C-alpha cells in the first residue's frame, strides 16, 4: 500500500498499458486531480473517477515503475500552495423547493435549513457545468430524490440538493436538483483561463451559513 505524504492508495493492473490508482480514503480526492494536471513521463492519459484514477501509459511499465512515477509526481507537486481551502458560503434560504422538501422529509423548513447549514461538505469533483461542484457530506435526512421534472433554468448561485450530494449552480442551466436558496459567492470567473477560473476545487471543504 504505497503512501505519498499522508495519502494512501493502491495501484492495480487494469489491462494493457493501464493502471488503476485506488484511494484508500476518498477524501484524498485532491491527489487525483494533482496527478491529472501534472505532466509526467510515460503517462499518456489520466481519467479521474469518484475515488480512483485510471492511468494509461505510452509504453509497457511494471507496477514498480508506475508506483515510482506516482510517488515522485505527488512529492513534486504537493506543496503548501496546493493545500485544500475551506469556504464559508452565505445563503438566503428562500428557495422554491423548501416546502416540497419539508413535506417529503417530514421535517420543518427550519429543520431543513439547520441540517443543511450544520454540515461540513467536501468538494468531490466539478461536474456538468463550469464550476459546478458535487459536494459530499449531505446529512442523511436530506438525501432525497431529485425533482421528477427538471426546471428549464436554475439561477447562478442556486444552492441545491439531489440524492446524496449538495451543490451550487455556477451558471444558468437547466436543473433537477431541489432548490434551497441562493448565494452571491462567486464560483466561476469566465475571464480567467487557468485553474483560478473556478473558486471551488476537489478536496476543498465548505459550510453554508444562513443569512436573512
List each model region and its residues.
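Glycine-rich active-site loops that engage anionic ligands at enzyme catalytic sites
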Residues: 2-212
Amino acid at each position: 500500500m504505497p503512501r505519498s505524504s499522508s495519502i494512501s492508495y493502491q495501484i492495480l493492473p487494469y489491462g494493457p498499458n493501464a493502471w488503476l490508482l485506488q484511494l484508500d480514503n476518498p477524501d484524498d480526492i485532491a491527489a487525483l486531480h494533482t496527478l491529472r494536471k501534472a505532466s509526467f513521463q510515460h503517462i499518456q492519459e489520466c481519467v479521474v473517477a469518484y475515488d480512483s484514477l485510471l492511468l494509461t501509459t505510452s509504453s509497457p511499465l511494471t507496477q514498480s515503475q508506475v508506483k515510482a512515477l506516482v510517488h515522485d509526481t505527488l512529492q513534486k507537486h504537493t506543496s503548501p500552495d496546493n493545500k485544500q481551502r475551506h469556504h464559508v458560503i452565505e445563503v438566503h434560504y428562500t428557495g422554491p423547493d423548501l416546502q416540497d422538501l419539508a413535506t417529503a422529509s417530514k421535517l420543518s423548513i427550519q429543520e431543513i435549513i439547520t441540517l443543511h447549514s450544520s454540515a461540513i461538505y467536501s468538494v468531490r469533483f466539478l461536474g456538468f457545468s463550469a464550476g459546478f461542484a458535487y459536494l459530499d457530506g449531505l446529512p442523511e435526512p436530506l438525501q432525497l430524490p431529485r425533482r421528477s421534472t427538471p426546471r428549464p433554468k436554475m439561477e447562478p448561485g442556486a444552492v441545491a440538493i439531489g440524492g446524496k450530494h449538495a451543490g451550487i449552480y455556477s451558471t444558468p442551466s437547466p436543473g433537477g436538483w431541489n432548490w434551497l436558496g441562493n448565494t452571491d459567492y462567486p464560483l466561476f470567473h469566465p475571464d480567467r483561463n487557468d485553474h483560478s477560473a473556478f473558486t471551488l476545487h476537489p478536496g476543498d471543504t465548505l459550510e453554508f451559513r444562513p443569512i436573512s
